[in-house]
Amino acid sequence: MSTITLERPPLAGCILRVARPTDQMEAVVDFYRDGLGFPELTRFTDHDGFDGVILGFPGAPYHLEFTSARGHLAGRAPTQDNLLVVYMPDARAWSRMIGVMARRGHRPVPSFNPYWDREGVTFEDPDGYRVVLHQGLWPV
């Protein structure tokens, strides 16, 4: 039996920031900004010991933040299954994006989970985190 709730959940309509550290700020920014096309929204230096770059589309309810802290080693992704998944319903736009990534020197890698290879292409950023460009709509 399901329950119908008329009240809006507290997180509905909120903005999501995915934040993580990096030891390779400019290489990571190049991957996401110049490769994947996320515009640079802002950059900060020595904010309580942190430097960072925030990427995203103006007005979008999500953005990416990359930070570095003096004296802190961020290291690489803990597994090959740390993913951002981008669902791209337009097949031509998806093909163009794959071409842009190739021209920027980013080569596809086999996905740890073979599900993502069936309708998508996976790229690994300089820190070992992965982005899946999935060709299709999100089914939910």
Language model: regions and residue ranges:
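Acetyl-CoA-dependent GNAT
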Residues: 67-72, 136-138
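Short, charged/polar, Gly/Pro-enriched secondary-structure boundary elements
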Residues: 59-64, 127-131
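Short beta->alpha connector loops
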Residues: 46-47, 69-70, 90-91, 114-116
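Short beta-strand/turn micro-motifs at beta-sheet edges
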Residues: 4-7, 70-74
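Vicinal oxygen chelate
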Residues: 1-11, 14-23, 43, 53-58, 74-140
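A generic structural signal for ordered secondary structure
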Residues: 36-38, 57-59, 69, 101-106, ...
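Core segments of cupin and vicinal oxygen chelate
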Residues: 12, 20-63
